[in-house]
Amino acid sequence: MTAASPTPASAAALPSLDRLLRLPALAALIEGHGRSRITQLLRSHLQMLRDRISAGQLSTPQLQEAVDGPALVAALDAALAADARLELQPMFNLTGTVLHTNLGRALLPDAAVHAVTRAMTAPVDLEFDITRGRRGDRDARVQALVCELTGAEAATVVNNNAAAVLLLLNSLANRREVVVSRGELVEIGGAFRIPDVMRSAGARLLEVGTTNRTHPADFTHAIGARTALLMEVHASNYTISGFTAKVDTAAMAAIAHEHGLPLVVDLGSGSLCDLASFGLPHEPTVQETLASGADLVCFSGDKLLGGPQAGIIAGRADLIARINRNPLKRALRMDKMGLAALEAVLALYREPELLAQRLPTLRTLSRSQDDMDSQAQRLLLPMRSALAADYSLERAPMHSQIGSGAQPGAQLASAGLRITSARRGGLDRLAKRLRQLPRPVVGRIAEDALWLDLRCLEPADEVAFLAQWSMLQA
């Protein structure tokens, strides 16, 4: 005889919300998460069961099991765990891009983390002058450090470099012309374009020269009664090679000053130290740019500087004063946590010989290929044992990049692990599985392989990394 099909569940058989809340099995969850939260999750669970009943996907025995105490607790635990994953998650960045915009850019040094914790957990003298017992300036400490480190007359800070450019242009060039080389009208991530920012700031863009060649005469001939300033935008996220010509900062400054105009330089990534001293390609520093005659320089805090997201403007005191008087300055200001972190990072630059030890960004960028290759050798066997038989894993030389638009042509000799698969789609499946680990692992797929660049994997994190990797066996 054929066994009878299970009786389809009826919506009328669903228990009431109040009855479920009174179940002894749920008491611990209610105590740990609150009645309101558990009530919300139960409503969602009951609606899911109601939908399955309407679709004919649930039998009476299945419904009875779904609302039984242990099964209900398991379902609520799973829902709570899923909600917890909505938080920002720590990840292992094995992409080979150090300052990865999508992964949060620069990691903060211990000094900055401690400073942020203090600012978060106690009242601080954010805008209070302790000596005089009255209101103070929230930017004062950062301004003093920036001036000390760069030689600038004054400085101010906002919450990112795009905001710095917007504020600067709105303060100095509203309804007036800004002269820029056509080859420097950059677009960075998220379709942020210099011409659009100028328009939003109320400035009128006057582009000169051509994409590949701009000469001093192009700037001289463009200056008129409506000109507010000359602007140089550092081409940090692309390169132009071949038949090219560019007016350097000193020459642009001379032209601007001859006509009584300021020269503004957007350095983008910005650096306060010579990267060549760490074995990296040279990047114009803020100090060099100011010494070349720039009146204002703006740059990011969370890129080569190695700090929190910030936009720093340094230069002439009279121009900084005009910027600070703009009502937009308050709308774009940094919060106390960002200021605390930035102050701590800038303070590290007072002892440049120790930067590579203390600043994660420089420590990571300056790692030797031999160091990473030794790390790959240590990880090879335990990682290989966790992979299925149709995957192959081997050590391999690689090339890292700085990221976040810094030195796009620079290739940093690196090392890591290269995974290939005998099955079609195997690499995509493995990459997805790695992203689903409790602490996701992100590499890059290229040339029929999954590349895991070890530049950003600190030796101190190897045990935690292997613990995640071993979960692939589950």
Predicted regions and their residues:
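Conserved PLP-enzyme active-site core in the AAT-like
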Residues: 133-349, 468
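A short linear hydrophobic-aromatic micro-motif
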Residues: 87-88, 154-155, 299, 439-444
